[in-house]
Amino acid sequence: MTSKGPEEEHPSVTLFRQYLRIRTVQPKPDYGAAVAFFEERARQLGLGCQKVEVAPGYVVTVLTWPGTNPTLSSILLNSHTDVVPVFKEHWSHDPFEAFKDSEGYIYARGAQDMKCISIQYLEAVRRLKVEGHRFPRTIHMTFVPDEEVGGHQGMELFVQRPEFHALRAGFALDEGIANPTDAFTVFYSERSPWWVRVTSTGRPGHASRFMEDTAAEKLHKVVSSILAFREKEWQRLQSNPHLKEGSVTSVNLTKLEGGVAYNVIPATMSASFDFRVAPDVDFKAFEEQLQSWCQAAGEGVTLEFAQKWMHPQVTPTDDSNPWWAAFSRVCKDMKLTLEPEIMPAATDNRYIRAVGIPALGFSPMNRTPVLLHDHDERLHEAVFLRGVDIYTRLLPALASVPALPSES
């Protein structure tokens, strides 16, 4: 794949690079510039534009293309505007320059996650409007802050607001992930993030002594139990070629805290873990297992949750789901191979599914290395433009799904 010269650059690519240059990077994203960018897109495309401030300084921008039948539920195209931090010294090019090399690769933070999707939505809608199309169902595009740090000041609040309910969303698309093969990954569910801190208290004393009932000994027992569980899940994944990472529960020890000096046995120590719990797990039984490991370690061992998502939802991927039927039919017609999976991480789709809206996570980037959050995150312009083509086919099918029994 080679690149066109600057004078020949596709206008969609130019717009993509313009958006990439907006520094919506955590922890201090320039959300105001992003909102202004989408307001201008709405003006140019003749779309409705609504700004919803879900928390001070956190604005969800909603662009709306009305359908011909307002009694039908709408299509929601969601994307987040923030991106993760960068280590500039590890990048070949400035991560906010949107540099395009001679081969057509665009280097920028957000190139894959997920500013490409935002522009692909917009450009697909632009094409369809220019061609004079109208569809029965309204299409809403939501551009949401805060996803990269949990969405607690973004989609989590937005789905609770009357402005969200007024959208009457019947189906949603959000981000997926690149796929290095010919296939396209599509996510129909997500693992649930549980952030757990285990605290152990014990006898303090001088570090030259063999003290009993120390905080470290008891914490070691819990850590060993959890890491043994981790190994068991890892082996289950490795031994079954049909399982994907999102189908098992992962855990990583992410923080150890305790101690005041080399020669003092600490009275308190703690370990923090990031669990990603598979949607088919019995959450009550799993929490009881965590508690039992703490109890088995001895007195004075407790756990607390910094985050505990308890609402896993699965969007059916068969013809019983008319949204999936429409989505997969277009992909089949375009000869796109789909690989349905459970998202191993967490996205804003979990909040959307939790309020009863079926949703798929889909980023049309095949033959592309997975570089989200990585140094030199990049996307080839041809892959980006192919994504616009795909959405240009998907949106008419989804926005023309016949009235469901609940809508008649």
From Swiss-Prot:
GO CC term (a single one): cytoplasm
Residues that hold Zn(2+) 2 according to the record: 113, 148, 373
Active-site annotation: 82, 147
Note accompanying the cofactor annotation: Binds 2 Zn(2+) ions per subunit.
CDD domains, A to Z: M20_AcylaseI_like
Reported cofactor(s): Zn(2+)
Record's catalysed reaction(s): an N-acyl-L-amino acid + H2O = an L-alpha-amino acid + a carboxylate; N-acetyl-L-methionine + H2O = L-methionine + acetate; N-acetyl-L-glutamine + H2O = L-glutamine + acetate
Alphabetical keyword list: Cytoplasm, Hydrolase, Metal-binding, Zinc
Record-listed E.C. numbers: 3.5.1.14
Cell compartment(s), UniProt: Cytoplasm
Gene Ontology molecular-function annotations: aminoacylase activity; metal ion binding
Gene3D superfamilies assigned to the protein according to its UniProt record, in alphabetical order: 1.10.150.900, 3.30.70.360, Zn peptidases
Family recorded in the similarity comment: Belongs to the peptidase M20A family.
Name of the protein this chain belongs to: Aminoacylase-1
Gene responsible for this protein: ACY1
